[in-house]
Amino acid sequence: MKTGRISQIMGPVVDVRFEDGHLPEIYNAIRVSHKAESESEVDIDLTLEVALHLGDDTVRTIAMASTDGVKRGMEAVDLGKPISVPVGNVTLGRVFNVLGDNIDLDEPLGVEAQRDPIHRQAPSFDQLSTEVEILETGIKVVDLLAPYIKGGKIGLFGGAGVGKTVLIQELINNIAQEHGGISVFAGVGERTREGNDLYYEMKDSGVIEKTAMVFGQMNEPPGARMRVALTGLTMAEHFRDELGQDVLFFIDNIYRFTQAGSEVSALLGRMPSAVGYQPTLATEMGQLQERITSTNVGSVTSIQAIYVPADDYTDPAPATTFAHLDATTNLERKLTEMGIYPAVDPLASTSRALAPEIVGEEHYAIAREVQQTLQRYKELQDIIAILGMDELSEDDKLVVHRARRVQFFLSQNFHVAEQFTGQKGSYVPLKETVKGFKEILSGKYDHLPEDAFRLVGRIEEVVEKAKEMGVEA
């Protein structure tokens, strides 16, 4: 391993000069270690990543942690390979940083743990699976109206407090319980408090044993925030490629990945592009997203929380992400106010899998009829608000009558929320979901009260709930 010396420090950007014609490759990791020699100094153990070559002997690097205490002239060792992180079953139930060091309170992983580099090529064409397979989540509104594809990419939109985290936890739980699947969670540039809460909530609900967690939070340098998504993805890829698993990969928040890339780009002196973003925005996003896919041995399905700056969907950051998405799940605050959980907007959420050749004719027809009924109800709400229900035609009254039952039946209790609600969570198989909505739309349950449809799983539970309320089916 060749050693060089630090020649310049500009915040998170560090220049390192090497002798004897040695120049580390782009993406190589460089380690700076220094023992404190006096009380005024601090121990330093810093990892840098090569970003640029400057001339014949100097590299410009991005620091993965704070550069406080680093001085010119300090020794830097080229490790000869990219940053590598632990992979495999040893990562389950644990929390890591961008470098793969555990940041939970348990024992560190031993040196025998297998480690993989975070930079790698996307699977080649001959490795990709050509089958489009639906990933059943057990969540009615998702499975019926915006189904997820195995190996697909799903965008999760929602403001603060509308249930993104609970939806993520339920997906992790359902995949673990029903499919025996594994999840990897990457916290990219979000609040440390939220990561802490998520960890303890997952511990309480028992989901943590099937999950690996990686965090590079808001307070960390841009290098860590930019690379932590790749750290999580590398762990997920190992479960897919080596263990043949169907993996769920969560990124919260993909916008912060772009934001960190923009900061790094500016620090490296690149000319900014549209709205001040990095000129390499599309390339960086593509390199990450192309690795998330189904292969012949397994799949990585990603669910990405997306922050939309100033609600501007034409902003280059979210717009670049949209190009890669197969489905969107939009969470709507108005639905939480009505007590409908999960608060997924059935009209705004989309999926390219909702096509008759993928989901089947019956599923497609029922889903479209549900959307048409809800859309008509939405159009009638203004008339109802001004004139009242009595002014509607008999046909429109029937639409409203059924739409409200459909809307309430799209809600259900979650397993991970049992400790808060006291209600047992429900996993609803896709066949049962389609059957339930088909019967509601046919008018079979028009005589049952609306509240019987609220927060239940299968259609049989509606009948039981109505009986408890004194109404016979």
UniProtKB/Swiss-Prot annotation:
Class of this enzyme:
translocase
Q: How does it sit in the membrane?
A: Peripheral membrane protein
The family database entries (InterPro entries) matched by this protein are listed as:
AAA+_ATPase, ATP-synt_VA_C, ATP_synth_F1_bsu, ATPase_a/bsu_AS, ATPase_alpha/beta_chains, ATPase_F1/V1/A1_a/bsu_N, ATPase_F1/V1/A1_a/bsu_N_sf, ATPase_F1/V1/A1_a/bsu_nucl-bd
- Its main localization is membrane
List the GO molecular function terms. ATP binding; ATP hydrolysis activity; proton-transporting ATP synthase activity, rotational mechanism
SMART domains reported for this sequence: AAA (SM00382)
Q: Which PROSITE patterns match?
A: ATPASE_ALPHA_BETA
State its Enzyme Commission number(s): 7.1.2.2
Known partners and oligomeric status? F-type ATPases have 2 components, CF(1) - the catalytic core - and CF(0) - the membrane proton channel. CF(1) has five subunits: alpha(3), beta(3), gamma(1), delta(1), epsilon(1). CF(0) has three main subunits: a(1), b(2) and c(9-12). The alpha and beta chains form an alternating ring which encloses part of the gamma chain. CF(1) is attached to CF(0) by a central stalk formed by the gamma and epsilon chains, while a peripheral stalk is formed by the delta and b chains.
Q: Spell out the NCBIfam families in the cross-references.
A: atpD
Briefly state the protein's biological role: Produces ATP from ADP in the presence of a proton gradient across the membrane. The catalytic sites are hosted primarily by the beta subunits.
Which protein are we looking at?
ATP synthase subunit beta
Gene name for this UniProt entry: atpD
